[in-house]
Amino acid sequence: MAQEKDCRIVFMGTPGFAAASLRRLAAWPRAHIVAVYTQPDRPAGRGQKLAMSAVKKLALELGIPVCQPASLKGAEAQAELAAFRPDVLAVAAYGLILPDAVLDMPRLAPVNVHASILPGLRGAAPIQRAVMEGWQPGARAGISIMRIGSRLDAGPVYAMGDTPIGEHTSGSLHDALAELGAELLVTVLDDLMEGRAVAVEQDESLATHAAKLGKRDGYINWTRSAAEAHAQIRGVTPRPGARTVLHLDAGTDFEARSMPLIVSPGTIGETAAGTAPGSVRHDGQDISIACGDCWYTLGMVRPEGRKDMPVRDLLNGSLKNLPQGVCGEARSPEESL
């Protein structure tokens, strides 16, 4: 029978996604977490005060030693890590490059929790890209537990798990995958300790890349199908945010204006056949925008400099007296310059 706390683990991670794995490892009877590595404290918030990472906060709560080197390329940092004599390096969204000398340190393996079904969506933004690209019915996202190699997210895979994308935003899918990854990580570490873990090489011909998102990735393209627009909006929620600009026509007691908005996921409505994509209409309660095939009713909206609000509040406030029916068009911020 295996002894308790016989797996010496150095955990490496930084954001909330990684904290889920650390929390689960701390509850695993075999885990002896000898150290937690996380990125240095960074300025955050309006005051730009130094803030601890989610992983550091949890490690301190758990009473685990914390190391925060700016790099692991130097001999001193590597010697400090080697002194922990890890059986495994358990890595999740750490954010620092691990040199070959570091990858060779653990007795069993350096293992990474990656939020995609590899070899698909290697890179920095697999969760957001999975939602944005997963607009077709039955689309799924997942987790891969892989052995870390010298190439980004290209190492052999020990285990995978998946879940339906459904109506997830990238924010809600992030949380679901963090928990799934934490469970799979413990399973793989147990298999490694028992000598039954098998890592399967990835098929390079199927590899795709999930590039980091920028603000422009949130500019909504209303010429696409409503399902694709809905997936784009969910994929960039909460960050970097789905953005459009309403160009509204003048009417009785209403001056023509342009209104930039960040929009939350809404609902797909009836066909918009015969209506130009981007056309805006309202019925006094909701604002809908014509996509390439159907109308899309907006969810919560956030005008510039304001907080999220129901569309009804916007229509009763800033857009009071906006003529009902088709009343303008929506364009991307780039097209509105």
Curated annotation (Swiss-Prot):
It is an enzyme of class 2 (transferase). Its EC number is 2.1.2.9. GO terms for cellular component: cytosol. InterPro entries: Fmt (IPR005794), Formyl_trans_C (IPR005793), Formyl_transf_N (IPR002376), Formyl_transf_N_sf (IPR036477), Formyl_transferase-like_C_sf (IPR011034), Met-tRNA-FMT_C (IPR044135), Met-tRNA-FMT_N (IPR041711). It catalyses: L-methionyl-tRNA(fMet) + (6R)-10-formyltetrahydrofolate = N-formyl-L-methionyl-tRNA(fMet) + (6S)-5,6,7,8-tetrahydrofolate + H(+). SUPFAM superfamilies: FMT C-terminal domain-like, Formyltransferase. The keyword Transferase applies. Gene3D superfamilies: 3.40.50.12230. The keyword Transferase applies. Keywords: Protein biosynthesis, Transferase. One of its GO terms (molecular function) is methionyl-tRNA formyltransferase activity. (6S)-5,6,7,8-tetrahydrofolate binds at S116, I117, L118, P119. Pfam families: Formyl_trans_C, Formyl_trans_N. Attaches a formyl group to the free amino group of methionyl-tRNA(fMet). The formyl group appears to play a dual role in the initiator identity of N-formylmethionyl-tRNA by promoting its recognition by IF2 and preventing the misappropriation of this tRNA by the elongation apparatus. Belongs to the Fmt family. This is Methionyl-tRNA formyltransferase. It comes from Desulfovibrio desulfuricans (strain ATCC 27774 / DSM 6949 / MB). The gene is fmt.
